[in-house]
Amino acid sequence: YFIIIIFTIINGTLNANENDFKEWLINFKVYALEKKISEKTFNLAMSDVVFLPKVIKYDRFQPEFYEDTKTYISKRTSSKKVSKGINFYKENTNLINTIENQYNIDRELLLALMGIETNFGTYVGKMDILSSLSTLSFDERRSEFFSNELIILLKLIEKNQIDYKLLYGSWAGAFGYFQFMPSTMKNYAIDYDCLLYTSDAA
C-alpha cells in the first residue's frame, strides 16, 4: 500500500506539473510575441517542447554545489584526455592556430575548455535544448534568467542563425563544443560552417 501511495503522489505531482507547464507555454507564447518573435517561428520551434522533470533534478543537484575543487577537477581530467587533446590539436592545427592569432586567445586555453566541456566535441549532450530551457523558465528558481535565454534562442532561430533541429546539448540549455548558452552564442560566437562542425566549435 505504501508503494502504491508514493507512486500515486509522484504521478499526481508530475501530472500537475505537466498541466501547469502547458498553461505556462500558452502564456510564454504571448510574452514571446511581445518580444517580436513571430508566431510562425514560435509554433515551429516550440511545437514539440515538453516538461522535463529530470532537468529540475539536475538543477538542484549540480556537482559544483557539493564537490570541492580537487574532486571536481580530478573527475574531469586524465592523461587519456590530455592525449586526446594533443591528437585533436594535431588534426586541427591550422584552424586552432588561426583562431589563436586572430582572436588573441591561447590555444592551450581553447583546448582545455573544450576538453572539460565536451571531451573535444565527442559528447555535446543529448538533451532537447528548447525543452530544457522551457522547463527551467517554467521553474521558479531562476525563471527570469532562463526565460531571457529562451527568447534569445528563439530570435537566433528566427534569424536563421541556428537550426532548431540541431539543438541538443546540456540540461541547462548550453550547446556546441564549448557549451555556450544562447546569450553567449549571440554575443561571442563566430560562424564558420555549422554548429556540428569542428570549424564552428569556437
Where are the model-predicted features located?
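Classical Sec-dependent N-terminal signal peptides that target proteins to the secretory pathway
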Residues: 1-16
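An acidic, Gly/Ser/Thr/Pro-rich helix-cap/linker signature
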Residues: 18-100
